[in-house]
Amino acid sequence: MTNKYVQYGCGLSAPKEWINFDVSPTLRIQKLPILGAVLKSSLSTSFPKNVQYGDIIKGLPVGDNSCDGLYCSHTLEHLSLEDFRIALENSFKILKKGGIFRCIVPDIEHLARKYISQLDSGNSVASISFIEDTLMGIKQRPKGLKGFIKSYYGNSHHLWMWDHKSLAEELKNAGFTQIRKCRYNDSEDDMFKYVEDESRFKNAVAIECRK
C-alpha cells in the first residue's frame, strides 16, 4: 500500500512527492477548462499543475484515516477561530492512527515582545508596527467593485494569531497527542524534508503531533 502525504494551503510550494491542496480563488479560475487558459496571463499567480483545489474547512477529497503525514505552513492564521477548529477536526479525521501532523504559524508572542521592547524604548509608532507585523489591521477600506472583490476573495490578512501554548492546547483538544515544538527537518519521517522550507520556521510556532 502506498503511503499518502497531504499538504494543504500549499501556495506555490508543491513537491511531487506530496498531494498538494490550496483554496485560492486564483487556482480555481486557473483550473477552469478553456477559460482558465485564456485568463492565465492576467492572473496574479500561476500555480504548479500538481496543485489541487481543496478546502480543509469543507473537507479535503481524501479518505478518513488515510494519511501518513499532514502538513500546513502559514495557513491556519488566515482562518477565523471557528474555522480553525474545524480545520483541526478535519485534519485529525484524515490522518491514520499514529500519523504525523506538522503545522507552522507566525508567533504572536515574538511579535508582542518586539512591540513591548519598541514601546519601552520610546518608539512612538510601535503600535502601528505591531499591527502591520501581525497583518491583522486594515489600512484602508476597500473602495469600488475591484476593491470589494479583492477584499472578499483575498486571503492575505491574518484572522487569528497563536503562540505555542495556545496552539498546543487547541491541538490537544482536537485529539492530537505527542505534541512538541519542532524544528526544520527534525521529523523522524523523511518525507517532511520534501515539503518544508527553513525560512518558514523563523519567528514562528512550529509543532509536530500525532493522531
Question: Where are the language model's segments positioned?
Answer:
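Conserved SAM-binding loop
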Residues: 3-113, 165, 207-211
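S-adenosyl-L-methionine-dependent methyltransferase catalytic module, highlighting the catalytic core
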Residues: 82-92, 96, 100-210
